[in-house]
A protein has these predicted regions:
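Flexible "arm" and connector segments at domain edges
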Residues: 1-108
Length: 108
């Protein structure tokens, strides 16, 4: 039986498939395709995060983080670089801890 995926997978997935006595049919993406597939994967992981809770949500957040690492590497940056920028933004603009919901802004 054949199952079609047509999506970016983690590096060890072909080995895991082979260990299950199945044959993965793969190809290596070019730079443009890789970027596009990472963007699709980020959206896919986002949707999974929204639909999960508890430890499942943590697992999905970890998947999302892995995609973010790969996207950062396309910009010749690391996850540490992303975290540094996030900290700088937190210092300047704050975090989301206070649960502030901005309804509107009135002119004085």
């Amino acid at each position: 039986m054949e199952q079609v995926y047509n999506k970016l997978v983690r590096d060890k997935i072909p080995e895991i498939i082979e260990s299950n006595n199945e044959i993965p049919i793969t190809r290596i993406l070019n730079d443009k395709e890789y970027k596009e597939e990472l963007e699709k994967k980020l959206y896919e992981e986002y949707q999974e995060v929204i639909g999960a809770n508890g430890m499942d949500r943590i697992e999905e957040l970890a998947d999302m983080l892995e995609v973010m690492k790969a996207l950062a590497s396309l910009e010749n940056k690391t996850l540490d670089d992303v975290i540094k920028v996030a900290r700088e933004k937190e210092i300047k603009r704050g975090a989301f801890n206070k649960r502030i919901y901005l309804k509107k802004v009135l002119k004085k």
